[in-house]
Amino acid sequence: MSMSDDTHNSLSTGKCPFHQGSHDRSAGAGTSSHDWWPNQLRVDLLNQHSNRSNPLGEDFDYRKEFSKLDYSALKGDLKALLSDSQPWWPADWGSYAGLFIRMAWHGAGTYRSVDGRGGAGRGQQRFAPLNSWPDNVSLDKARRLLWPIKQKYGQKISWADLFILAGNVALENSGFRTFGFGAGREDVWEPDLDVNWGDEKAWLTHRHPEALAKAPLGATEMGLIYVNPEGPDHSGEPLSAAAAIRATFGNMGMNDEETVALIGGGHTLGKTHGAAAASHVGVDPEAAPIELQGLGWSSDYGSGAGGDAITSGLEVVWSQTPTQWSNYFFENLFKYEWVQTRSPAGAIQFEAVDAPEIIPDPFDPSKKRKPTMLVTDLTLRFDPEFEKISRRFLNDPQAFNEAFARAWFKLTHRDMGPKARYIGPEVPKEDLIWQDPLPQPVFNPSQEDIVNLKAAIAASGLSVSELVSVAWASASTFRGGDKRGGANGARLALAPQRDWDVNAAAARVLPVLEEIQKSSGKASLADIIVLAGVVGVEQAASAAGVSISVPFAPGRVDARQDQTDIEMFELLEPIADGFRNYRARLDVSTTESLLIDKAQQLTLTAPEMTALVGGMRVLGANFDGSQNGVFTDRPGVLSNDFFVNLLDMRNEWKAADESKELFEGRDRLSGEVKFTATRADLVFGSNSVLRALAEVYASSDAREKFVKDFVAAWVKVMNLDRFDLL
């Protein structure tokens, strides 16, 4: 054994050698497991936003706290703030309206209808990466301007709600009549780690619009909300931007009319900022030195603010009245001829060559400039379909106002889920199709009704597997990101869900349950489907020797087909559902990663996911009735056999084919095939974190615990969309 000179010297002087040197000894430093194994399964995604990160505690009730809010006073304070220009960040034309509208838009605009993630619902603009995206330059200033108001009202208003309300008030104070406002967005206290923002390693890396259809990405460049305002990959070509605009707005569920209305309305107030080259701008908030206290993008050009501000690098003002609502965007768009030019920062934009200088300077009343437009603004004139809509808005300002009001409301509320989640005095009465509306309940079963329904289900001849499968098929469409899907509404019986391959088994069970509904007279099919799962789980638990009553909350209703947007519900069809051993495509991630994705959408913890998969397997709930993962000789019994046999070292697993999606478990001594499994099964033995959980449930003293944990997780999934119980 050798000893370095430094170590020898330390010992000779009586100093501990391990307390010397400059290595980073802070928690989390050093080479991580993810560094060694970058493809490691992200089980940690299931541990996000726990009570350990929440300073308000698990008993905090935001809806109750919001009810104490003086809503009128809050809006009054926001209105006053709009014109309270601060010397450290002066307001353009004495108004922060454009800044706050952009803040609200960029908070909501990250939403993607493909997977329901992103959006304004949790105030994520406060955290990385969004707080430091290139498209969000200067929004750190907007949030700091709001801080005195947030400080004043405390927990009665969340940051997430305040961001959107500030945008609404900015529009209203500028003379626009909004469609309404629904509060109810609850803050979280750490970044969302589950959102896939893309694989690019450099900001503003270009993506072709066609690529957006292959992934749940909402922008054509890394770090942008939608599209590059200079055209695809800085092309400067308005017409070529049309496909990108349609792709990105379409990924939010917006049609052409909504897209034109949002662009025109969003560019009616305020301006862009490009006083000088981007080389003057410092690092983003996450990279900023500690003394800047979370503010980024410091500029050494002039004062760095006001007329010297650099944000996007574009220097565009669309309207003659940039602090008052008007139809000038469309009037100027069609009235003038536009020539390509560059901003002082060198960004490509357009100027109205034949226009007089009619645009006011934001800080010097004696100065005027010509109207300017973004490359993507001119797309609304030169793309044939966008042009038709734009001309209609030009000639009918009231139609534009109505379209923008509705599109803005949709933009800012799209990720909130059903209207039952909305709170506050300005919630619109009208039901909108994108809210997945439900009829009002007309019947709530009594305990006697429930007992009778359970008896009818038990006598129906349906197996435990069928009862459990139909309930899971109904409830498991829920997405925690945008709160869509779930069992309420019984949309499992409607198009498109009734025709999904994954629901083939459920489609055979539904007619039996529909007959029970007809016999009952008043109970909803939605309640009966969930109650079928209750009956199945209770029977399976009893067969395992555990007597347990599965909690059931009645009151679900049945949606109509005309309340169901088929195109939007198609997006809820799973690519994979590891709980049912279903996978439709092999070209998207790994099976085990898709299981984590599904569990995260269902807001499950890792232990909850583990208990549910183990239970679903022994209950025979595979979508196709296969024996994959059914590690038991007593299917239909809610036993811990899945875990016991998975961890049994007498079994040896080998891939059954080159795809390594199907595996055979053989007896090590005889070579006999005892079980078959998928990757969604074997991951509970191969992944070290999941194996640790599986070992708990495989233990000899875990029989009753497993049943209780399965039931708790099951009930959670069945009630994920019961916002009427809040």
From Swiss-Prot:
Obligatory cofactor(s): heme b
Record EC number: 1.11.1.21
Alphabetical UniProt keywords: Heme, Hydrogen peroxide, Iron, Metal-binding, Oxidoreductase, Peroxidase
The reaction(s) this protein catalyses: H2O2 + AH2 = A + 2 H2O; 2 H2O2 = O2 + 2 H2O
Site keyed Transition state stabilizer: positions: R102
Catalytic EC class: oxidoreductase
Post-translational modification: Formation of the three residue Trp-Tyr-Met cross-link is important for the catalase, but not the peroxidase activity of the enzyme.
InterPro entries xrefs: Catalase_peroxidase, Haem_peroxidase, Haem_peroxidase_sf, Peroxidases_AS, Peroxidases_heam-ligand_BS
Gene3D superfamilies given in the database record: 1.10.520.10, Peroxidase, domain 2
One Gene Ontology term from the biological process aspect of the record: hydrogen peroxide catabolic process
Cofactor binding, note field: Binds 1 heme b (iron(II)-protoporphyrin IX) group per dimer.
Any one cellular-component term (Gene Ontology): cytosol
Chain positions of cross-link Tryptophyl-tyrosyl-methioninium (Trp-Tyr) (with M-252): W105-Y226
CDD domains referenced in this protein's UniProt entry, alphabetically: catalase_peroxidase_2
Covalent link (Tryptophyl-tyrosyl-methioninium (Tyr-Met) (with W-105)) residue numbers: Y226-M252
Record bears the keyword Oxidoreductase: yes
Active site per database record: H106
UniProt-annotated binding residues for heme b: H267
Role this protein plays: Bifunctional enzyme with both catalase and broad-spectrum peroxidase activity.
Subunit record text: Homodimer or homotetramer.
Protein family according to the UniProt entry: Belongs to the peroxidase family. Peroxidase/catalase subfamily.
Protein name as annotated: Catalase-peroxidase
Species annotation: Citrobacter koseri (strain ATCC BAA-895 / CDC 4225-83 / SGSC4696)
Name of encoding gene: katG
